[in-house]
Amino acid sequence: MAKSPATTPSPRHAFAKTLKTFTTASGKTGQYYALPVLAKTYPGIARLPVAMRIVLESVLRNCDGKKVTADHVAQVAQWQPKAARTEEIPFVVARVVLQDFTGVPLLVDLAAMRSTARKLGANPKKIEPLVPVDLVVDHSIMVDHFGTKKALDLNMKLEFQRNRERYEFMKWGMQAFDTFRVVPPGFGIVHQVNLEYLARGVYQKKGVYYPDTLVGTDSHTTMINGIGVVGWGVGGIEAEAAMLGQPVYMLTPDVVGFEMTGRLREGVTATDLVLTVTEILRQHKVVGKFVEFFGEGTRSLALPDRATIANMAPEYGATMGFFPVDEKTIDYFKGTGRTKAEIEAFEAYFKAQGLFGVPNAGEIDYSQVVKLDLGSVTPSLAGPKRPQDRIELGKVAGQFESLFSKPNAENGFNQAATKLLTRYPLHRTEVTATTVAPPPVPEGAARTVSEMESNKPRLETARTNAVTHTKAPAALAIGNGDVLIAAITSCTNTSNPSVLLAAGLLAKKAVEAGLKVQPHIKTSLAPGSRIVTEYLTETGLLPYLEKLGFALAGYGCTTCIGNAGDLTPELNEVITQNDLVCAAVLSGNRNFEARIHPNLKANFLASPPLVVAYAIAGTVLTDLMTEPLGKGKGGKDVYLGDIWPSSEEIRALLKYAMKGKAFAANYAKVKTEPGKLWEHIKGVTGTAYTWPASTYIAEPPFFDTFVIQAEANSKEGTGGNGQKGMQSVQGARIMALFGDSITTDHISPAGS
C-alpha cells in the first residue's frame, strides 16, 4: 500500500473528482477512482452487474479524452439490461497472460519491432509491453511415457528436446523485456498457475489502485473469473494491442444472471455441476454475453468449484462466467499464499468500491435470469462428441448404444447395430515395456522442416513403459466402447482439490478391494500445478493412483489438448482395420471427435474419480450405477458405490490442499529453482534478438520495407493519405467455409 498520498491526477482527467482514498485493516491507504462517487451522477450504477461495474472502473480510470472518452464512461454507467447492442466499449486491461503455443508468435512480433528499431537507429528498449505479460509454458508436454514413476522425467526430456529452439527464444524474451515473465515448463497449466499465483486481486500504479483485469491468448482464460477477475480469451492481435497499452474493444454485452439455490447432494461433484451448467447455458444461447452467478447457492460453492465453472465458459458459449468477490475469495487468497498486504488491499478496495459480496436475487438488473437448484444436479458425463451433451451416469451405456448406429448428422457413429458387441483379437506380445526412441537433436538453433517433422517418437516405438507391475493378457480382445485412454488432466478439474482427493480416495479403496486396470489402457495423471502432487503425496493417496496406472506424466495440458501421445501400433491397427468406436474418458473441458486421439471417436468428459472408475471398468458399456466395476478379491463383484468416497472423507483431507506456505514455496521456485532442463537452455542475450538461420523462429517480413519508406518519408514527405507505404488489402478471399460445430480445435497444431 502507498505510505504517502499519491500524485494528484492531471487536471485534464474529466473525472478527477472521483479520486478518493481507502484504508486497509492495517491502516495503510491507497487511492482509487470511486464508483460510489460516480453513482451520484449515474444512480443506476448500484444496480449494474458486478462485472459491468469492474469494466466501468477501467473506462473511468483510463478516460483520457482520446481512446477513452467521457461518452464511453456515460455509455457503460447507463448500461441497460435489454438495450440494443450497437456501441463498443474500450476496455483497458491490467495485464496479459499467454500460453506457449499462442504466446510465441506475439514474442516474435515484439522481437521484430525491436530489430526494426535497431535498424532505424532507434533504441530497441523503446519497444516494451506497457502492462505485465506472463507466459506459462504448458502446451508442449506430451504423454509419451505413462504408467511409471519415471514418466514425468522421460516426458520432460522429450519435451525439451523437441522445443529447445522455442525455449531459447523465450529465455531471450525474459532477459530482454522488463515487463515479460516466463513460467518455465513443469510448473503447471496457465489458468491454474494464474489462479494460484499470478492473480493479485488489485494492482496499483503511482499509488492509484485498480482491479486485476486481463485478456489471454487461450479460450479458458475465463477460469480467473472464479476469483472475481474480469478477463477472457482473445486472439493474438487483440492480445498484442493490449500488451502495448491499447484498449480491447468489445460490443456492449448482455449480462445473463445465473441464480443458484440449494446445495449439492452427497456424491455429486463440481464436475457434475459444471457439465449441468454447460448444458443449461448452451440451451439459453449465451454466445457473446457475460454470465454472472448470484444467489445463496452460489455463495455456498467453494472457490475451486467456482473456478471450475468459470473455466468452461467457452463450452457454454459465454464471454465470461463471472463470480463476484466475497469472503471465500479472500480465504482462497490466504490459502494460496498471497501476502497479507496483498489480501488486505484486495479486500479493502473491493469493499470501498461496493463490489464485495455475491448479490442476492433482485439486487441487480440482468438481461436475463437463469435458475438452477443445486440439489437437482446428478452424477454425469458429457459426450461422446460435444461438451454440452450431458448424460446422467446411469444412462451413459444406453446412450452410447443408441448413438452407435445413428447417422453422423444425429451425433451418432453410423455403425451397424449388429457390430456393437463384436470383439476383435489384439495381436501383441506379453511384454508391456518398450522405450520411446530419443528424437534427433540437431546442433545449433536452425532446424530443417524434415527435422521438425521427425522430431517425435516413431510409431513403432510409441508404446511406452506402461504398467510394468503386471503383464498384459496373452489373448486380449478389443471392442466398441472400450476405454483406451483414461486421463486425469486439465486445469478445469485438477485445480479443484475436492475432485482430486475423491479420485485418490476411490483409487485407494479400489486397490484395497483388489480391482485393477488393464495395462493396454493408457492411464495418466497430469495436473495443472505441482501443488496437486504435493497434497496427494502428503495424504498418502498418490501411491494408490500409481498402482492403477495413474502415475504422474507431466504438469501441463497433455491429453486435454490432444497431447495424449500415441496408442500402441497393435491398438491402432485393430481400431482402424475394424472401424471400431473406442473411447477416451478424461477430466478435461473439450471432447470434439478426434481431439484426444485421431483413432478414438468417442470422448467423454468426467470427474477425476469417474475417470478412475471407467479405467477399472474398461468400457463405457458398463452401467456404473447398477453393474459391477469388476471382480475384486476372491472373485467378488465390486460396485462403484462400494468405493465411492463420502463428502466427509473428502472434507477431512482438504486441509492438506490449502496451505499458504506450500503455495508460496512452490511458486518461489519459478525464479530460484526453475529446473535443470530449463537452466541448461542457452538463451540469446541482448536487447534485440539475433535471428538464427531457422525455418521456425524466423524474423517476419512485415517491416522489410519499413526503413526504405521511413527514409522516403523524410525526403519526400508522406503521400496524399498521409500514410506513405500503407497498402490496402485487395482481392482477399475466404480460405475455407465450414459448417456448424467446426472449431479452431480442428486445425490447431496442439497435439498434432
Where do the PLM segments sit?
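N-terminal amphipathic, basic-rich helices that act as targeting or association modules
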Residues: 2-3, 9-159, 188, 301-311, ...
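Generic recognition of flexible, low-complexity loop/linker segments
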Residues: 19, 85, 124, 204, ...
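Cytosolic catalytic domains that perform sulfur/thiol-centered chemistry
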Residues: 20, 30, 382, 388, ...
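Long, structured ligand/cofactor-binding scaffold of large enzymes
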Residues: 64-260, 270-275, 379-382, 395, ...
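Terminal amphipathic helices with adjacent charged low-complexity linkers/tails
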Residues: 92, 110-165, 292-446, 626-691, ...
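Mobile "lid/hinge" segments at catalytic clefts and subdomain interfaces of large enzymes
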Residues: 199, 205-352, 356-357, 373, ...
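Short amphipathic
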Residues: 257-261, 367-375, 732, 736
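Long non-globular sequence segments
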Residues: 286-287, 406, 696
